[in-house]
Amino acid sequence: MLFRSGAGAVGLMAIIIGTRLSPHDVAGSERKRDGVKAPMPRRGFLVFGSMFFLMASSQSMFVTFGSWLEDEFGFTEAGIAGVAFALGAFELLASITSARRADVWGKERSTIAGALLIVPSGVLLALLHTHQIPGLVLLGLFLLGFEFAIVSLLPVAANIIPSAPGRGLGIVLAGGMLGRASMSVIATSAYDRYGIEWPAIIGSISAVGMIACLAWFSRGSRS
């Protein structure tokens, strides 16, 4: 069930990026291109790293929160499913809000704002994980921050190779999938040994890594 939540997030990303592409991008897909693939700019790998860390951060919670609710509070499968459903609605709200804010704040700033919500939420969850209501609220804020960030990061990814937006987006999403796969092993192992505290902390640290990569990318954009 937890992996379905992650798959739902990826599906939502695909829908959102389709709606966020400008008419120029869509028209560009119809233009004839030569056989030479557009190269990935060096700075683009900072966006690749941003996606890696952001998806790793979310995965640290996606693969562990069900076990945490069951072990710590005795949640049944139905109870965990109810929490997952509520979190999905929460994430949808964050996606809509982020899509609006990105046009006002800018894509990079909106992405960093979402990650900045993840960092304290993960740390506080590690400290308050034995308290059900605060823990659930912090889990919701953690995932809200992720959803806010991912919606804003996708247009950045689509624009790193202006002449081939699909290629740029594909490369960056591959970084995200690598982050998810890596964190699935790390987070579950950490949970088995230490409980939810370490996955929550690791998720916060990953969000800091995302902020660092994107801040570096943004600084290069302005120079």
What are these regions (language model features)?
Residues 106-153:
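C-terminal transmembrane helical hairpin of 12-TM major facilitator-type secondary transporters
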Residues 5-29, 213-218:
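C-terminal membrane-cytosol helix-exit motif in multi-pass small-molecule transporters
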Residues 18-48:
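Juxtamembrane intracellular "pre-TM" segments in multi-pass secondary transporters
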Residues 1, 69-70, 101-102, 186-195:
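Interfacial helix-cap and linker-helix signal at transmembrane-aqueous boundaries
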